[in-house]
Structures are given as C-alpha cells and as structure tokens.
Amino acid sequence: MADMRTRWILGFVGSATVAIVAVAAAQGRSEAPAPGGDSIQPDDLQADVSFLAGDKMQGRRTGTPGNRQAAEFIASRFGRSGLTAVGVNGSYFQPFDLMTATLGESNRIEVSGVPAVDLTFGTTYYPDPTSGTGTASGDVVFAGFGIRADALDHNDYRSSFALDGKVALILNHEPGEFDAGSPFDGAIASEHARVVRKVLAAQTAGATAVLIAPDMHNHEGPRGTTRPRRSVWPERPPRRPRYQVAGWVRDVAIPVVQISGDLAARMVENAGLTMRELAGAGAERVGGIAAVPLPEQHVELTTSVHRRFHPNRNVVGLIEGEDPVLRDEWILITAHYDHEGADGTRVFNGADDNASGVAGLIEIAEAYRLAGLDGLRPRRSVLLAAWNSEEQGLLGAWSYTANPIHPLGQTVAVLNMDMIGRDEEIPDGGGARFYGLTAQTAASNRNAVNVLGYSRSPDLKRAAERANRVTGLTLRFRYDNNASNLLRRSDQWPFLHEGVPALFIHTGLHPDYHTERDRPDTVNYGKMARVVQMVHALSWNLAQSPTRPAYLSR
C-alpha cells in the first residue's frame, strides 16, 4: 500500500490513472485480488518503467553499462521487498557466460574429386561460428539432418558401422519442416534444428568434423551456402556482438564448416548418388536415416575460430514457502530486462519490451512482502527471475535451464511476462516483424492479453482463467502453433523445451515494437496493472494448490 513504502510521486497523472484502473477493475472483477495484490498500482509501475526505460539506461543492451545498472536496480528492489538472495555468494545474481567468435586466418578445405579451384572461401565454404579450431580429415558419411532425438525415437546416427574417424555431412533445418503433423513441432522449427545440438550429437557419435549443407529437399533456390558468408562473418566487426551460450559451444572441439549445395551435390554425385535422393527419401525418413557412406569421398580441413567469453548475469530472488513439503516445489515468475541498446542518436528504450515485465516482477515482489506482513505466505516457494540476453536468443533463460538454481523437476510452473503494457496492433502488410499475424487494430484489443503455452498444460490454462476473475481481462489463447513462432520467442520456451509447464503473458506486438518509439509515455499503465494483478493471483493460486499442473508433450 502507498503509505507503507517509499515510492516516486508522479502527481496528478498517476493519481488519475489509479482512479481509472480502480473503476475498470471493479467493473470486471468477480474475485478479490490475491493477498497483497491491491498494492499493484499504475503509478508504481510507471515509476519503475520510467527508470528502466529512461534515456540514461541507453536501451539496456547486454554487455553495456545501462544493462548492468538495470541489474543492480532490480537486485536493490528485490532486497527492499525482502526476497531471499539465492544467487552466487549470497547475492541476487546468477552468473553465466556468453561467447562471441571471430574468424581466424587459416581456413581451408580439400575434397577428393573436387578441384581446388572450385573451393572458394566464403562462397563454397566457411567455418560455422560454433566451430572448434583445428585440423581434421576423414571419409565422408551422409547423416541426414544430423539429429539425435531419443524422445522422438529419431537418430540419424543409427547404423551398422562406426562413425569414428569419419566426417559427417548433414543438412541444416529438420525433417518435415513444412508438415504440420511432424513430430518436430509441426511446421515450426524445433530446438533439434539448432546447429550446436547437431554438432554435439555428431561429435558424440565419433565424427572428426561436420559439414553442413543446405536442405535442398525443402528449400528450392540458389545452391550456395546456407547463408552468405558476410552475414555470418562480416568484413568489419559487427556493431552489436553476436552472442551464444558459452556452455553450449565450449564443448565443441571439432571443425564445423558450412558448405554450398553445389559442393555437397558434387561430393554425393562423385559417390554415384544424388543429393535430392538422399535429402528426400533418405533424410526425411521417420526415425532417422541409416547413415550412408560416400565411397571415395575424403575431406581434409582446417578451421580457425577465436572464441571470447563474456560474463553476464540473471537477477534472482526467492519468496520461501511455508509448507514443510511443498516449499521444495517452486513457482517461477520471470521477465527479461535487456533490450536493443542505442544506435548513434537513437535510444531503443524498450519500455514495453520489456521494462513493463520487469516492473511487474518488482511490484509482485512487493505484493508478496505486504501479504507476509499480514501473516499470509505461499505454501510453495516463488522465485522471481529477471533474465538477461533475451534479445540475443533467450540466452539467460537457456543458461538457467542448463544450470538451474533448483531442480527443474521440482519447478511447478513458469509465468513469463514479456511486453505487457500495450494493446496488440498488427498493421496490414506490416512486414517481417509481424509475419504470420493477422492484421488487427489496437481498439480491438483494449482489454485483451494473449496467453501462450496453453496447449502444453490445460491445467495451467484453467488456472489462468480462474486468476483472471480478479481482473476481468479478455484472455486470448492463441498463437501457440502460429507461423509467427511467438511461443518460442520469449523466455518461457527453454522451460517448455525441458517439460516444465509455462505460460507467456503478452499484450501483443505493435508498430513501436523494436523501435525508438517504445518509450515510457506509450505504455497503458492502467491495463498493465491489471495484467500484473492477474499474474500475481495466478502465482498465488499455484503456490497454494495441493496439486501441480501437468505438462503435455506435443
């Protein structure tokens, strides 16, 4: 409540907004807020967003002073609300490393039966950024998409011969890429298509090196490399570093080289086969391909990739449960605090994306503190986590799932808030940012919030519907299997990938998304307060429930 803590005073505008949301909430509310939930008010949220998304923070990009300052601010607010510090050395920080790669000088490839003049660096081949540095050689084996997915009973390395000492030729992407019924998440690329996962599977199977060719079965067009060399290895250092999770790449010790479709076809044809035959009927086979040796195709290659490691951190704080048994089961409430940084005179403030979600975390922490003052505590423990490096590929959340503070098997649910302060507005013909989304106006979404992850846990969907009785929002359960791939574009995805029930709370994209126009004065703080109250109520209900939500694999 206002008189129980220090808060920034925003004057008449904040007071008026409080009045508006109070009326709106009263109109749609059929249940009282969860304990402490009445403290979640627009003026406090506005103060938090205004600080996090102010120009002085310079867009909070990973690795910048503004990003580090944001982390310190969140930690200080967690401390003020009495959260238990469960990070490293009794702090609120969970450290993790990211990696960037630069191209070295010595990179070459020699393929038997292919003249050296045809092997042009940057056009015919180049090292992948995941590559180890070193020299390797071996006979070539075609191994389909290079996927081993035991849960799907798919293994492209099942074979009667050993891969030891061989060079694996694999395709990028995955089987059934445009098949809605594919076990690999239908027509949306799954985690099994990630290059580093394929490389580690090949390395474990004994490969000395990996060659990655374009998937010509599913993708017609130029037969060059998967991506132009300049898009992977720009001639000048990129303005914004390209990060990877260090824990993934650190284990890669073998050379990894992207090659052109033409080179792959030449190698296969020299062995008396055809690439389309292998890529189609072979690689697309259910359960994986029986790896195919390519007779008389021998490769020698050298790669030089310099790795640099960068320390980063998530911010974590715990509300300890009071039940002696259930306290070992955790609810996670999460939001990412990084954004896109600054570009010359432009600052990408990231007010909605995602100062809004972080402000929600901060005010939920305070709501739990106030409930505790009234003697009300959750039965299960609740971890509040602010992830870093979401904009670089959910890297903070991936790092957590690789090294969780608490076992994922004892994580009951994850509630992720990302962009919770606007009305969804999809312009007609809006371009790549809005791919797969139907044109709609902001006015049609005034009271709406998207909830994703529902298809993986009907129990969690029902819990969200119950929690919404507190606020009367319009919950839209859509986009789980949409071509926009939204379900996989925020920090709930690493948890869903690990089988943990998770919801993505998201008021939707809009024309200011990832532009310098995403500023604090564009956020609807009244609506945002209701969204945060709903998430708080949902977390409280889950923490008190005698049962935990089930997870359904796709």
Predicted regions and their residues:
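N-terminal hydrophobic or amphipathic helices/low-complexity stretches enriched
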Residues: 26-85, 263-266, 328-330, 552
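Second-shell loop/turn segments in exported
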Residues: 31-39, 55-65, 97, 107, ...
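Soluble metallo-hydrolase cores and metallopeptidase-like ectodomains found primarily
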Residues: 33, 112, 120-160, 247-350, ...
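Noncatalytic luminal/extracellular "stalk/propeptide" segments of secretory-pathway proteins
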Residues: 58-181, 295-296, 305-307, 311-314
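Metal-dependent peptidase/peptidase-like ectodomains
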Residues: 116-120, 132-133, 244-277, 387-504
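Extracellular/luminal Protease-associated
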Residues: 119-248, 252-255, 320, 346-348, ...
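Short helix-loop-beta-strand segments that form the rim/entrance of peptidase-like active sites
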Residues: 365-393, 417, 422
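His/Asp/Glu-rich mid-to-C-terminal helical/loop segments that flank catalytic regions of hydrolases
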Residues: 366, 506, 510-554
